[in-house]
């Protein structure tokens, strides 16, 4: 028997986890046919795409992110510079064989690399960017990838053991609705020395050279009954060919006019790992 196509693999995975999915239009429970058509009782329907992704937006939405950005992000993340962060996340996950939702997953590399390190994990990535989800489905067939909006998410309540929110905007009300009892929200936010070598070269003596995410951390603490904060700080060597990719993938890089002048031998990753639970 030949290998299953990416689309067939996705259909199998959706069938196995269909109870997670709610219609983004009317919130009714979804079903899926053998042919890969997802539909609810009101007959709102959504097809699994050829590459295995699912488009679950109730209306079209624009994203500012390009295919080139996601290709750059894929290269940078898979170079290993975020491995320490990913391992720190894995160390905090308590549930056996967890179901994870990565909110704002982009091209999927963080979720895929985290799931690889956890026995029996099932990963679902959601992002408003169709380009990001197309890239994720192209790169990784082990996880499910959905174009969707967190403000109107296509999932039922109490569906996930872990919700990841990595360097991405959050919706804490929705996170708590989607979280299983005893589940964890794990959020990553930049700290003051994140990519400091880039900021020093590009934005010397300007407000962009330094910043703080103290308000984001405080809001997270206020949103959950139990929280924990861990600082992750390390510096890694940076290969020359990764520098333009790093500039392409980060919003900070978009504002640099003379990109060719940036020369980096190393880069600092400085993050807060926030863990929230409801008691």
What positions do the PLM features span?
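Conserved SAM/SAH-binding beta-strand->alpha-helix loop
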Residues: 127-131, 151
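Conserved SAM-binding loop of SAM-dependent methyltransferases across substrates and taxa
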Residues: 107-119
């Amino acid at each position: 028997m030949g290998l299953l196509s990416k689309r067939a693999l996705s259909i199998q995975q959706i069938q196995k986890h269909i109870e997670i999915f709610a219609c983004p239009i009317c919130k009714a429970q979804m079903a899926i046919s053998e042919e890969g058509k997802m539909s609810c009782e009101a007959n709102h329907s959504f097809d699994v795409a050829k590459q295995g992704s699912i488009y679950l937006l109730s209306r079209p939405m624009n994203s500012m992110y390009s295919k080139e950005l996601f290709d750059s992000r894929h290269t940078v993340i898979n170079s290993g510079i975020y491995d320490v962060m990913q391992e720190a996340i894995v160390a905090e996950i308590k549930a056996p064989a967890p179901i994870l939702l990565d909110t704002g997953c982009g091209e999927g590399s963080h979720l895929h690399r985290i799931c690889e390190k956890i026995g029996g994990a099932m990963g679902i990535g959601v992002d408003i960017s169709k380009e990001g989800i197309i890239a994720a489905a192209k790169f990784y067939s082990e996880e499910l990838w959905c174009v969707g909006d967190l403000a109107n998410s296509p999932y039922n309540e109490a569906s996930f053991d872990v919700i990841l929110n990595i360097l991405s905007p959050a919706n804490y009300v929705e996170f708590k609705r989607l979280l299983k009892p005893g589940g964890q929200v794990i959020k990553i936010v930049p700290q003051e020395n994140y990519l400091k070598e880039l900021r020093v070269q590009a934005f010397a003596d300007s407000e962009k050279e330094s910043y703080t995410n103290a308000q984001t951390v405080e809001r997270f603490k206020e949103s959950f009954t139990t929280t924990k904060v861990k600082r992750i700080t390390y510096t890694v060597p940076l290969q020359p060919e990764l520098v333009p990719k790093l500039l392409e993938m980060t919003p900070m890089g978009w504002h640099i006019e003379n990109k060719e002048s940036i020369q980096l031998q190393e880069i600092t990753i400085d993050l807060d790992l926030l863990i929230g639970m409801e008691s």
